[in-house]
């Protein structure tokens, strides 16, 4: 084979020409027509072909937590290139881009202010397209992802995910829900209080929604090709009852917040978007100790498994039915109303159940296991018809270890207050003009 410049330039391509391409380390043939088949139409919509997507597959009742990832694996890096840490103001506008290698600095190398209540430390995620499918013949769950507008795919709107657990702070006579470093997170509040405090910060803010968390969790699955977050970030082995009933000995911490291992921002010393620290030691008020490993993924600290539950907005369960908010940013109601839409029935049994509706990778309606606990985990009730249940995510120190992965719980009612329940801040991206869930046609 001669040098590239030794060959004359082709003219008037007809589509039946053959090219040599490098695929999985081997040189193979491809036609111009095949490459053109992946091109968008005149409306900018791409066809659903392997070149335009990365696909994650998992079999129902699969014992392993690992997944099969196929098609264009280079799409994973393209999707993750859309995400970055930043500081946003009270209008949810980016005021500083943080250094992805070292978030204590801006991209310009200047010191970053991560503890100012007027600027929230967030990770911008979303901005891609995805599609869920189920193959009944092979009993396989399939999720497809693309940075392109692929026909039949739904748009995942850009949004800001918290870098840190939620902190309630009073400023100007109003409580605000913050995502700041070097502060104690706030537990022992109800979801209405958290959401109100988020809205006090600005119209685009909200207490983190289940939909926000699901996107974050799916990105972990896609990046790690595995569903068991505790395989990478172990926070098991806590005495949950003791932890919940023992006040934090630090005088700066609220004594009602019994589930804090450290102030936010401890993982800022981890370079890059993910990793965990060496074992740290926590000392209880009675002198007892526990060790743990602070971690972060996608620049967000402690959102895959942790010592306390995080209350979420965006979904409700009542009378054995699940509902989701039609618009997670504008919905402020915590009761079933016109702002919610029905998605599926919940089982009418009493106890815990795993693997539920389509928004997860393990919908029980399609035959998923009710015992493996590979994903969602919530309380079902046999007779209740009036109470409203809300989702909680991440997992308590004992619950998370029982489940073995990031998880979803549901709580009894919207107004309870527990020392092992916190929340976190999320925000819409007002610069994104495409509605969430838009289907490419």
Segments and roles (model prediction):
Residues 16-23, 300-302:
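Short hydrophobic/aromatic-rich beta-strand motifs
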Residues 1-16, 439-441:
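Short, intrinsically disordered N-terminal pre-domain segments
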Residues 166-191, 323-349:
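A solvent-exposed, charged loop/short amphipathic helix patch at secondary-structure junctions
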Residues 214, 236-267, 308-317, 330, ...:
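C-terminal, surface-exposed recognition/capping segments
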Residues 21-38:
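Short, surface-exposed terminal/edge motifs of secreted or surface/virion proteins that either
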Residues 23-26, 128-130, 166-168, 212, ...:
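Acidic glycine-/aspartate-rich tracts in secreted/extracellular proteins
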Residues 42-129, 133-182, 272-275, 297-298, ...:
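Short acidic-hydrophobic catalytic motif
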Residues 116-119, 144-304:
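Short aromatic-cysteine micro-motif
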């Amino acid at each position: 084979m001669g040098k590239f410049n030794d060959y004359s330039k082709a003219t008037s391509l007809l589509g039946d020409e053959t090219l040599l391409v490098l695929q999985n380390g081997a040189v193979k043939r491809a036609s111009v027509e095949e490459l053109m088949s992946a091109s968008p139409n005149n409306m900018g919509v791409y066809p659903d072909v392997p070149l335009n997507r990365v696909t994650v597959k998992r079999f129902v009742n699969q014992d392993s937590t690992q997944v099969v990832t196929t098609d264009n694996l280079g799409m994973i890096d393209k999707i993750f290139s859309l995400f970055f840490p930043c500081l946003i103001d009270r209008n949810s506008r980016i005021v500083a881009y943080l250094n992805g290698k070292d978030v204590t600095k801006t991209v310009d190398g200047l010191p970053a202010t991560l503890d100012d209540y007027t600027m929230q430390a967030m990770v911008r995620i979303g901005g891609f397209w995805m599609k869920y499918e189920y193959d009944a013949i092979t009993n396989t769950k399939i999720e497809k992802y693309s940075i392109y507008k692929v026909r039949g795919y739904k748009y995942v709107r850009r949004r800001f995910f918290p870098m840190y657990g939620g902190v309630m702070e009073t400023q100007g006579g109003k409580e605000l829900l913050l995502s700041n470093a070097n502060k104690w997170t706030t537990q022992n509040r109800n979801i209405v209080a958290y959401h109100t405090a988020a809205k006090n910060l600005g119209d685009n803010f909200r207490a983190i929604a289940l939909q926000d968390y699901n996107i974050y969790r799916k990105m972990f699955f896609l990046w790690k090709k595995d569903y068991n977050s505790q395989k990478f970030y172990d926070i098991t082995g806590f005495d949950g009852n003791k932890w919940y009933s023992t006040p934090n000995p630090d005088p700066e911490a609220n004594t009602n917040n019994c589930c804090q291992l450290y102030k936010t921002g401890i993982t800022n010393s981890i370079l890059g978007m993910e990793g965990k620290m060496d074992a740290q030691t926590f000392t209880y008020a009675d002198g007892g100790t526990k060790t743990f490993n602070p971690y972060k993924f996608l620049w967000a600290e402690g959102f895959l498994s942790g010592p306390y539950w995080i209350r979420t907005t965006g979904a409700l369960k009542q009378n054995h039915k699940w509902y989701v908010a039609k618009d997670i940013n504008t919905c402020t109601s915590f009761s079933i109303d016109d702002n919610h839409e029905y998605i599926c029935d919940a089982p009418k049994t009493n106890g815990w159940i795993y693997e539920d509706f389509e928004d997860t990778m393990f919908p029980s309606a399609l035959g998923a296991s009710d015992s493996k606990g590979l994903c969602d985990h919530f309380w079902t009730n046999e007779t209740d018809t009036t109470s409203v249940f809300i989702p909680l995510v991440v997992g308590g120190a004992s619950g998370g270890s029982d489940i073995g992965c990031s998880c979803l719980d549901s709580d009894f009612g919207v107004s309870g207050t527990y020392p092992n329940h916190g929340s976190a801040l999320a925000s819409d991206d007002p610069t994104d003009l495409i509605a969430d869930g838009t289907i490419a046609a």
